[in-house]
Amino acid sequence: MQNQRIRIRLKAFDHRLIDQSTAEIVETAKRAGAQVRGPIPLPTRKERFTVLISPHVNKDARDQYEIRTHKRLVDIVEPTEKTVDALMRLDLAAGVDVQISLG
């Protein structure tokens, strides 16, 4: 697996959960002997929703909600077979979306 890299993108609503997951990935990759670049924080996506709280009158009465999607990027440069096996066995939290690409 020479001259390859593994790019891991993580998404989560809870920033503590995503930081914990990236720390586990980085620690596992370093223990397996790979060179790691990251975690790189990507821009957080903020979605805002405005809801009318009055069913009939009082148009100015509204509630606003927001949900934030936190993202991180981890690059593993020149991974070995041991690194890939260790990452495959890694069990991450349920609230984290993981996308892996080889390049």
UniProtKB/Swiss-Prot annotation:
Transmembrane segments: none annotated. One of its GO terms (biological process) is translation. One of its GO terms (molecular function) is tRNA binding. Gene3D superfamilies: Ribosomal protein S10 domain. Part of the 30S ribosomal subunit. It comes from Haemophilus ducreyi (strain 35000HP / ATCC 700724). This is Small ribosomal subunit protein uS10. InterPro entries: Ribosomal_uS10, Ribosomal_uS10_CS, Ribosomal_uS10_dom, Ribosomal_uS10_dom_sf. It comes from the Bacteria. Pfam families: Ribosomal_S10 (PF00338). Keywords: Ribonucleoprotein, Ribosomal protein. NCBIfam families: PRK00596.1, rpsJ_bact. GO terms for cellular component: ribonucleoprotein complex; ribosome. PANTHER family: 30S RIBOSOMAL PROTEIN S10 FAMILY MEMBER (PTHR11700). The lineage of its organism: Bacteria, Pseudomonadati, Pseudomonadota, Gammaproteobacteria, Pasteurellales. The keyword Ribonucleoprotein applies. Involved in the binding of tRNA to the ribosomes. SMART domains: Ribosomal_S10. Belongs to the universal ribosomal protein uS10 family.
